[in-house]
Amino acid sequence: MLKEDAVFVHARLVELSREFGRACWTILGEGNISGRIDQDVFAVKSSGSSLATLTEIELTHCYFDRLLPVMDRENVSEAEIEGILRDSRVRDTALKPSVETFFHAYLLTLSGVNYVGHTHPMPVNQILCSGVGTSFAEERRFPDEVVCCGPVSLLIPYEDPGLALARRIRQDVKNFESKHGKPPKVILLGNHGVITIGGSVDAVRVAMSMTVKAAEIFVGAHALGGNVPMPQREVDRIENRLDEEYRRRMLRI
């Protein structure tokens, strides 16, 4: 029988997963989600399952301590990774976790992070498969993008999904934290997709939704002659306004 905390996390993850799927931000087996159960265990989407139709049985519980040390190992073969993913399961009858479970394990260790979402929205990938990804990541176009996604996003060039990507995410998130004093709310993956993280499912949902909206505006602005970002002083102002902090609390983000 699942603990009460696990039941709550499962319910929120299934809700979030199906919402992402209904929005067509993933198709087939694309994307994944995860949530912390306790200090030792997290739940993550199983390999090949669909976000649009995810059920609780397709959430696999994994041990952090069977995944995180692997990120420091060199020359890990694909066959070894398969074995490591299977061995990370709390129950050996559970479905195999996603190959991207490594980055979920890392991101869920960040202070204040309890949930992670990863999707492949077409508007975002139009940008991430172009030459203007840096502009999209580093600039903001409207106030609510600042409120929901932070003043800047982290852009990571393409890496092979799996262990290599998890290592690059860890390295670049640490650099981002050193520069900005906190982790990014939004991580953009070149030629791949987007990750949002937060303390609640609402934070992950809101950041993902606003990133997709911002991408649609960005693409449209370029079609109409060019992107016009907010001045940096105004971005900083919105990020630190007391009324916007109140809105974040009301939105549970």
Language model segments and positions:
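Glycine-rich flexible loops
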Residues: M1-I253
